[in-house]
Amino acid sequence: MSQANHNDTHNNIDDNINNHFNDSESLDTLDISASDNIDDEVLDGFYHREQLLSVMMATLDYIDERVKKGLILPYFDDIDTEQWQEKIKALDIYITDEDEGRELNLEARQKDYATNILSYPSDLPAAIIGLMPTLPLGELVICHAVMVREAAEQNKAAVQHINHLLVHGILHLLGFDHELGQAEQDEMERFEIEILAGLNIPNPYN
């Protein structure tokens, strides 16, 4: 994929995302960090905070609407709906290279290869969360090299793939897991498709 194509697509998606997002109106918090092996040019070129925060907010807005209608969040099922709705959400994103990505995947999942994204839920009890000003969702680790390779293989812009991975990862942090069975996979994919559609991002599974 050429840099020009990447930038053109990136600008189109940014326009759609900006319609959904105003940083001054955001209470949710997002922290982005990276391995020492990830250049600043990579962070600046691919991982724009405003873009990622907007996708985070769109995902949580979508989930909030379904929580109101009775959706259970597996990892936050001991937190009442009102508390979930009122708490400011916090998310950490860490960008890494393929070597560290492989090490982390081996440690976390006993898989000896780098994967596109790993999710580390906060796992805090409701009693502790109730005392905190923010509700920590956990941490997502994105392997940049794998993300870029997959985007090229799937013939999609890197920014589209990043947005999809972020939605996918947040759903994992909430306790949704496509590996539990076909019904869980179908539910999670439906959520992803609908969230991305709200940002004018095409179905990632087509």
From Swiss-Prot:
Alphabetic keyword roster: Cytoplasm, Endonuclease, Hydrolase, Metal-binding, Nuclease, Ribosome biogenesis, rRNA processing, Zinc
GO biological process, one term: rRNA processing
Role: Single strand-specific metallo-endoribonuclease involved in late-stage 70S ribosome quality control and in maturation of the 3' terminus of the 16S rRNA.
PROSITE patterns: UPF0054 (PS01306)
Family: Belongs to the endoribonuclease YbeY family.
NCBIfam families attached to this UniProt entry: rRNA maturation RNase YbeY
Co-factor(s): Zn(2+)
A Pfam family that the UniProt record links to this protein: YbeY
Region Disordered, annotated ranges: 1-20
GO cellular component: cytoplasm
Organism of provenance: Psychrobacter arcticus (strain DSM 17307 / VKM B-2377 / 273-4)
Enzyme class: hydrolase
Catalytic activity, EC: 3.1.-.-
Subcellular location: Cytoplasm
Cofactor binding remark: Binds 1 zinc ion.
Molecular function per GO: metalloendopeptidase activity; RNA endonuclease activity; zinc ion binding
Binding annotation for Zn(2+): H168, H172, H178
Protein name in UniProt: Endoribonuclease YbeY
